Amino acid sequence: MPKMKTKSGATKRFKKTATGFKHKQSFTSHILTKKSPKRKRQLRGTKLIAKSDVASIKRMTAC
């Protein structure tokens, strides 16, 4: 059986860390005027992937 190809989109979106995978928070690119400063502040930075999604991310990124 041939090797599975990695999903190139997933490779760009998720980075492997020591404890799991991190990703950029969504809802931060446009239409920011209606979002409160608190909401925008909390959307900053990166978040860790939920434990239930780690297996599927591993399959997509071949880590």
Swiss-Prot record:
MF GO annotations: structural constituent of ribosome
UniProt xrefs under PANTHER family: 54S RIBOSOMAL PROTEIN BL35M (PTHR33343), LARGE RIBOSOMAL SUBUNIT PROTEIN BL35M (PTHR33343:SF1)
Family, per entry: Belongs to the bacterial ribosomal protein bL35 family.
Keyword Cell inner membrane: no
A GO term from the CC aspect: cytosolic large ribosomal subunit
InterPro entries assigned: Ribosomal_bL35, Ribosomal_bL35-like, Ribosomal_bL35_CS, Ribosomal_bL35_sf
Keyword Transcription: no
Biological process annotations from GO: translation
Pfam family, one: Ribosomal_L35p
Keyword vocabulary terms for this entry: Ribonucleoprotein, Ribosomal protein
PROSITE patterns found in the cross-reference section: RIBOSOMAL_L35
Protein's name according to its UniProt entry: Large ribosomal subunit protein bL35
Superkingdom as given in the UniProt entry: Bacteria
Renumbered residue ranges of the record's region Disordered: 1-22
